[in-house]
Amino acid sequence: MNWQDGLAYAHAVCKGDINVCKAVQLTCQRFINQIENKEWEWQFDPDYPQHILDFAAALCHTKGPDAGKPIVLEPFQIFFICAIYGFRAKKDTSKRMVTDVILFIPRKAGKSTLTAIIALYELLCGEKGAEVFTLATNREQATIVFDAAKGFIENMPQELSGLFAVSKYEVKKIGDTQSMFKALSRDTKKTGDGKNPSCVIIDEAAQITDRNSIEVLHSGMVARANPLRIYITTASFTKETKFYEDMNLYKSMLNGEAADNPRWFGLLYGLDPQDDWRDIEIWKKAN
């Protein structure tokens, strides 16, 4: 897997070669504009996304007909990683530009696999004393990404799996006693109070009506040099949530209705308002 596949995806979307909604088109054009901008404080360094892609290539699928086969990410997933990890501060390339991320996409699109890779990478290669958490409304949902990550470790070659210490409810990085990767949920009353997260993956974020559980974890990230918060979700009938508030803000940035904040990145797959949902060809926009 190569970072250039992510760049190619963005260009293909902007050329109209891939049928996606307006929000994804605008995101891809924004990404290209950011790469071409030589006048601001950030620069695109492909070595950083390539590093996590190389890590992903060492992992194998753990379920279904592809079990045991190496992970091969889709172009949109490679683009997702490029956008998150590629932009670095010119004065200090260890500092990542993107800190807040949204992946809004239908089910069975590989978002749990993708974010499990990111979670393990952040635990292994992120800040010393990394604290990585998944958050959801219930324990079952919160453990989906966590269990996927544990499955990757169980199927790693020894030289890689030996870098992790795995227990039922926690994964640690060997040699870093302050590191941890855990699943949190509201129903078990295990939330982010007192935590100092470096990476948080909020699963089915659109379903979380208790905004405090999100805000507590977010406020705990302020001391981190490279915090990363990722919303992954499908749509929800409940719109009065912290997630929809943040997604609407990001949409406003894309549409030029709000000042652009480069610390935010999002891929929002879906249909456009004028689309006829009965047209099967249109479904490709959301999948």
Segment roles from a protein language model:
Residues 1-287:
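Phosphate/NTP-binding elements of NTP-utilizing enzymes
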